[in-house]
UniProtKB/Swiss-Prot annotation:
Keywords: Host cytoplasm, Virion. Transmembrane segments: none annotated. Determines virus infectivity. Pfam families: Lenti_VIF_2. It comes from Caprine arthritis encephalitis virus (strain Cork) (CAEV-Co). This is Virion infectivity factor. The keyword Aminoacyl-tRNA synthetase does not apply. GO terms for cellular component: host cell cytoplasm; virion component. The keyword Glycosyltransferase does not apply. It is found in: Host cytoplasm; Virion.
Amino acid sequence: MQNSSRHQQKKRNKKPGPELPLALWIHIAESINGDSSWYITMRLQQMMWGKRGNKLQYKNEDREYENWEITSWGWKMHLRRVKQWIQDNRRGSPWQYKVGGTWKSIGVWFLQAGDYRKVDRHFWWAWRILICSCRKEKFDIREFMRGRHRWDLCKSCAQGEVVKHTRTKSLERLVLLQMVEQHVFQVLPLWRARRSSTTDFPWCRDTTGYTHAWSVQECWLMEYLLEDE
């Protein structure tokens, strides 16, 4: 009797989980209805990304900046936090990354209404590839076409290697991207994309590359602007 009453007490004290927006419930229902393996696939992807991947590393700092970097085989990105922009309420956007020889702010909040999803697109494209643990090394176009190196990479990293080693809008890039199109896309949960050593790391406004793949057209026009020194 005592165990039974204790069980009932626990049941009464049980708190409901977080309330999700109706639109999200509709999306979940439609996804499950369309593919019975949807939930299992998402859980496996989350477990996979919880264990693997590269992380942002603190390097050093001076009076004005904290310097950070992330590396993934032949890829490297330099980032910094502007100290005077760091706020106590954690709502600031102090992050910048080095692109094309200049420092560009990311995660900036805009006061005017509008569609800002594509503002930091180049950063999130490169970030998706950098946090992935695929072995991005020894790229050779002939070997890539034979499939020797290509199938060691996930779809996002394979697209990234093509963009890095070919010219924008070239026929060579288009042919290689068409070959990569056969790869199975690996979903990367957005919580993993934002996992960082600091609380003010920016939110991803565009889910391209994380919940769905970049198109051939988008990669064909993409410029590689990182500095890998």
